[in-house]
């Protein structure tokens, strides 16, 4: 919504619940249950395309949509020995840090993951992949989450997580 005029317009999605590919006009692209949106410092709009298991970006200069994380496959984290996977399982919450990294909830895998904008890689930031509560005061990678649906990051890089099914807001800091 343009606050000056009160006009609402569509930035992404054609109203069809599907996946229609990348490098097309964002308003002609299909999304399936978008549930999170965040704005990068460079004006890029990031969308949690939840039921397509992807994080998408809309370029402000071209209006084109692209996938930045997720490949449409269903991801189920199996443990720390497992190689990193580009797949996501129902990403919902999304936030962009001042460093340009995109933080996301990998909700059905019970993880918080981060996409590094420079290296174009995705890694696990928190969660064990098991829906339970645990790990307060310890290593974030050993801390358990249960269906996290929201994430935010402040200017100092502290990450806040809506640990939805544990009915808690969790904080990930450099010392915890």
Functional labels for PLM-detected ranges:
Residues 18, 48, 105, 131-132, ...:
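Glycine-centered low-complexity coil/loop motifs and glycine-rich tracts
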Residues 39-42, 96-99, 153-156:
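Residue-level detector of Asp-centered blade-edge/turn motifs that repeat once per structural unit
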Residues 149-175:
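Blade-level signature of beta-propeller repeat domains, shared across WD40, Kelch, NHL, RCC1
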């Amino acid at each position: 919504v343009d606050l000056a005029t009160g006009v609402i317009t569509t930035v992404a999605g054609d109203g069809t619940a599907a996946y229609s590919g990348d490098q097309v006009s964002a308003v002609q692209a299909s999304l399936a249950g978008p549930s999170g949106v965040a704005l990068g410092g460079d004006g890029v709009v990031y969308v949690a395309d939840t039921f397509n298991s992807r994080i998408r970006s809309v370029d402000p200069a071209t209006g084109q949509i692209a996938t930045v994380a997720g490949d449409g496959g269903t991801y189920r984290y199996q443990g720390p020995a497992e190689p990193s996977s580009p797949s996501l399982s129902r990403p919902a919450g999304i936030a962009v840090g001042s460093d340009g990294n995109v933080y996301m909830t990998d909700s059905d895998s019970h993880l918080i993951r981060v996409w590094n904008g420079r290296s174009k890689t995705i890694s696990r930031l928190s969660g064990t992949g098991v829906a339970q509560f645990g790990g307060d005061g310890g290593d974030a990678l050993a801390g358990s989450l249960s269906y996290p649906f929201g994430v935010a990051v402040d200017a100092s890089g502290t990450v806040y997580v809506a640990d939805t099914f544990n009915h808690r807001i969790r904080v990930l800091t450099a010392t915890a």
